Regions:
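Active-site-adjacent structural segments surrounding the nucleophilic cysteine of cysteine proteases
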Residues: 1-68
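Intrinsic-disorder/low-complexity loop/linker signature
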Residues: 10, 64, 70, 93-94, ...
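Helix-adjacent hinge/juxtasegments
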Residues: 50-92
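Noncatalytic regulatory segments and standalone regulatory/sensor domains
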Residues: 102-104, 124-155
Length: 155
């Protein structure tokens, strides 16, 4: 769970500031507590370690940014969730449509809102936003839910 941490916090890695919304959704859904300076440092370390392990893609073409296709993307949802965020879940690998009914066995739901770009948030089973890494982002305020990612409990 994030306490007092926003995606725009300057102590976070710039790549998290720009592309870390889904990553921060994992942190919010986690039973671990990320708070203050220590929490931001822990998140930066997790991002770096997960990138080294290939769970998150890095600067693929080595041009010094993460704005190219396939960069700063979570590639192994299950490993990231379980190894770094203590979430005992399994991603089904599907981008579910916004109008699909969420099964009762789903433990965690992340939604992708779209308006001038995409932004991930944590949803409850009624599809209401329970966490937005920017607080009240323009994408959520002005956009619409395009798809969902479902994570099932492992046990």
């Amino acid at each position: 769970m994030l306490k007092g941490i926003r995606q725009s916090d300057k102590e976070l890695l710039p790549v998290i500031n720009d592309y870390g919304c889904l990553f921060l959704c994992f942190a919010q859904a986690s039973p671990l507590i990320f708070e203050g300076k220590e929490g931001r440092q822990a998140l930066n370390k997790i991002w770096s370690e997960a990138t080294k392990k290939g769970y998150i893609s890095g600067d693929i073409n080595h041009d010094g940014d993460y704005d190219d296709d396939g960069e700063a993307e979570i590639k192994n949802h299950n490993a990231l969730a379980n190894e770094f965020f203590a979430l005992d879940v399994r991603y089904d690998g599907t981008h579910h449509k916004a109008d699909e009914k969420i099964p009762s066995k789903v433990k965690v739901v992340f939604g992708k809102y779209v308006w001038k770009g995409g932004h991930f948030v944590v949803l409850n089973k009624s599809k209401a936003v329970t966490f937005d890494s920017f607080g009240k982002s323009n994408t959520v305020q002005n956009g619409k839910l395009e798809s969902m990612r479902w994570y099932y409990a492992n046990s």
